Regions:
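Beta-lactam-recognizing serine transpeptidase/beta-lactamase-like catalytic domain environment
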Residues: 1-207, 251, 255-266
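Low-complexity, flexible helical/coil segments
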Residues: 25, 56-58, 69, 230, ...
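Short alpha-helix boundary/capping segments
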Residues: 134, 183, 212-223
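Conserved catalytic/cofactor-binding microenvironments
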Residues: 235-259
């Protein structure tokens, strides 16, 4: 029997789905994953591009590793629910976030937008494909929950940008050392997009085998903030002017919100 825990031991938590994302709960992710059959879970992974090349045209691009359902062990589904048991490239991971930012439609990435000849005529890059992966409503709900990650109660408050709504997710993964075939060190990451309510850019930060502090939010968040701040300013992307209405992250906050809403409706 395999017992799963969150990375940091804690008292029992009663989290909402947004709370599971905000605090990066492994056990919460497992419980959400259990709502899906293995085939459905695998189908969503493949639709998001896991296990296949992105179509970017980058030379040497890897497909990553996604085992077939028939090859899963008893622990595959739970570990895959929180991001272990398969591998993907930074381009693949960023493409997943771009799909959520793009209202659930996955568009194959391209290294260049196109070419312009001596006369100034622009020719778009060929071969881009698109596929709906999730509904626009689901994508919007995901974006709202991912804003909680960047809140003061999430794992990446250091990714917040003053005046802008930011959404994202941290990653702190055990790192495979090919020399021993064992886990050694960590891969810290943060991928996010802004403005969260009208996404314009997605930025991915990955730090391999950091020494000392190894949390994705603490390491990747500040880098994301600097890069995204520059991009938004240099591309003249103005703040949307809207504010983020915090989503309850746990049972107590959810009950309080329901009581507040009931009072407002009376």
């Amino acid at each position: 029997t395999k017992v799963f825990h969150d990375h940091e031991r804690h008292a029992t938590q009663y989290l909402t789905t947004a709370g599971v994302l905000a605090v990066s709960s492994n056990t919460g992710s497992i419980q959400i994953g259990e709502l899906l059959s293995h085939d459905t879970f695998y189908d969503y992974l493949t639709k998001f591009g896991v296990g296949s090349k992105t179509g970017s045209g980058l030379p040497g691009e890897s497909r990553g590793i996604l085992p077939k359902v028939a090859d899963w062990s008893g622990t595959s589904a739970p570990t895959m629910a929180f991001g272990q048991g398969y591998s993907l490239t930074a381009m693949q991971a960023t493409s997943i976030f771009a799909t959520i930012a793009n209202d659930g439609v996955r568009v194959s990435p391209t290294v260049i937008a196109g070419t312009r000849d001596a006369s100034g005529n622009f020719t778009p890059a060929p071969g881009r494909t698109s596929q709906r992966v999730i509904s626009a409503e689901t994508a919007k709900a995901m974006r709202l929950m991912m804003e909680s990650v960047v809140s003061g109660n999430g794992t990446a408050p250091s990714a917040a940008i003053a005046g802008y709504r930011v959404a994202g997710k941290t990653g702190t993964a055990q790192r495979i050392d090919d020399t021993c075939g064992c886990y050694r060190g960590y891969t810290a990451s943060f991928i996010g997009f802004a403005p969260a309510d009208n996404p314009a850019y997605v930025i991915s930060v990955t730090i391999q085998d950091p020494k000392g502090l190894h949390w994705g939010g603490a390491l990747g968040g500040p880098v994301f903030k600097k890069v995204m701040s520059f991009v938004l300013q240099s591309r003249h992307i103005a703040p949307t002017g809207t504010t983020f209405d915090p989503i309850p992250l746990n049972k107590k906050a959810l009950a309080a919100k329901k009581a507040q809403d009931a009072t407002a409706n009376n």
